[in-house]
Curated annotation (Swiss-Prot):
It holds the Pfam family Glycos_transf_2. SUPFAM superfamilies: Nucleotide-diphospho-sugar transferases (SSF53448). Catalyzes the transfer of 4-deoxy-4-formamido-L-arabinose from UDP to undecaprenyl phosphate. The modified arabinose is attached to lipid A and is required for resistance to polymyxin and cationic antimicrobial peptides. It comes from the Bacteria. Keywords: Antibiotic resistance, Cell inner membrane, Cell membrane, Glycosyltransferase, Lipid A biosynthesis, Lipid biosynthesis, Lipid metabolism, Lipopolysaccharide biosynthesis, Membrane, Transferase, Transmembrane, Transmembrane helix. It catalyses: UDP-4-deoxy-4-formamido-beta-L-arabinose + di-trans,octa-cis-undecaprenyl phosphate = 4-deoxy-4-formamido-alpha-L-arabinopyranosyl di-trans,octa-cis-undecaprenyl phosphate + UDP. The chain crosses the membrane at residues 235-255, 270-290. Belongs to the glycosyltransferase 2 family. It is an enzyme of class 2 (transferase). GO terms for molecular function: phosphotransferase activity, for other substituted phosphate groups; undecaprenyl-phosphate 4-deoxy-4-formamido-L-arabinose transferase activity. NCBIfam families: PRK10714.1. The keyword Membrane applies. This is Undecaprenyl-phosphate 4-deoxy-4-formamido-L-arabinose transferase.
Length: 326
């Protein structure tokens, strides 16, 4: 068994987008939780182009004397996972913990994550106990988790919970990946050797609404499908073969029925032919849409634009980049 590397410093990365109401409690509770650790710590909050006063509040927190807060300000909104990657580029700890800013997952769970990670795990995931979300969000999350488990082979039960802990070598591996669309829990598990999950508390959102609208959830599902696997492309070939064979057999059946039952019967078959035709056309459009998703991602990757651009870092540590490395 390999030697377990000690954790000498803990970094907490929190993406923030229009969370000015929850920030005071978030800073207070996260700092209090980190003070329970035996290791030094830093709290990196990434403002993802907020339109409220979140950026100013983060800057003020980072500028306080003796503050362990680092404020990373992005020039616009790039999305939750890109913001977390920007935070990863600033960390100096041996263990990195991610946390949402809405306080649905309590920061008080941080010491537990550190304790479990000290047992030698590369990734410590979490499962939300008594999840306080709508039926729709729970159902969508359940479907997405099933898809991810089948694609990755990692039997983790709650990929949607961002309260997670990663060893430093996992962070370095993720920073060396330059695909434009990134889902961090999945990407981390592709590099992790030892993973585990623990149950954590989950509270109702106290301030504001979820930043994931229905359209964003749909986009997330497409991102997951196309960034996880090429299986949909293979399925297109299978579906195409099945549809073509079914069409051929149906054509043979219609010809046989016409020969047996006479031309009078065939008049009603026109509508059947139209229905079959529209079915085939619909299948073609679905296939074209999936191909378009993959081609669009290839185009985005070929342009090689940064996933984010950091406008300002307050409390900046030396030798950290303000732009994603290529």
């Amino acid at each position: 068994m390999s030697r377990v590397e000690p954790i000498k410093k803990v970094s907490v990365v929190i993406p923030v987008y229009n969370e000015q109401e929850s920030l005071p409690a978030l800073l207070e509770r996260t700092t209090a939780a980190c003070k329970q650790l035996t290791q030094p710590y830093e709290i990196i909050l990434v403002d993802d182009g907020s339109s409220d006063n979140s950026a100013d509040m983060l800057t003020a927190a980072a500028e306080q004397p003796g503050s362990c807060v680092i404020a990373v300000l992005l020039n616009r909104n790039y999305g939750q996972h890109s913001a977390i990657m920007a935070g990863f580029n600033q960390v100096s700890g041996d263990l990195v913990i991610t946390l949402d800013a809405d306080l649905q997952n309590p920061p008080e769970e941080i010491p537990r994550l550190v304790k479990v990670a000290e047992e030698g795990y590369d990734v410590v995931g979490t499962v939300r106990a008594n999840r306080q979300d709508s039926w729709f969000r729970k159902s969508a999350s359940r479907i997405i988790n099933m898809m991810i488990q089948r694609a990755t082979g990692k039997s983790m039960g709650d990929y949607g919970c961002m309260l997670r802990a990663y060893r430093r070598h996992i962070i370095e591996a993720m920073l060396n990946c330059h695909e434009r669309s990134t889902f961090i829990p999945i990407l981390a598990n592709t590099f992790a050797r030892r993973t585990t999950e623990i149950e954590v508390l989950h509270a109702e959102r106290e301030f504001g609404d979820s930043k994931y609208s229905l359209m964003k959830l749909i986009n997330l599902m497409y991102d997951l499908i196309t960034c996880l696997t090429t299986t949909p492309l293979r399925l297109l070939s299978v579906v195409g073969s099945v549809v073509a064979l079914s069409g051929f057999l149906l054509a043979v059946l219609l010809i046989a029925l016409r020969l047996i039952m006479g031309p009078e019967w065939s008049g009603g078959g026109v509508f059947t032919l139209f229905a079959v035709l529209f079915t085939f056309i619909g299948a073609q459009f679905v296939g074209m849409g999936l191909l378009g998703e993959y081609i669009g991602r290839i185009y985005t990757d070929v342009r090689a634009r940064p996933r984010y651009f950091v406008q300002k870092v307050v409390g900046e540590q030396p030798n950290h980049n303000t732009q994603e490395e290529e």
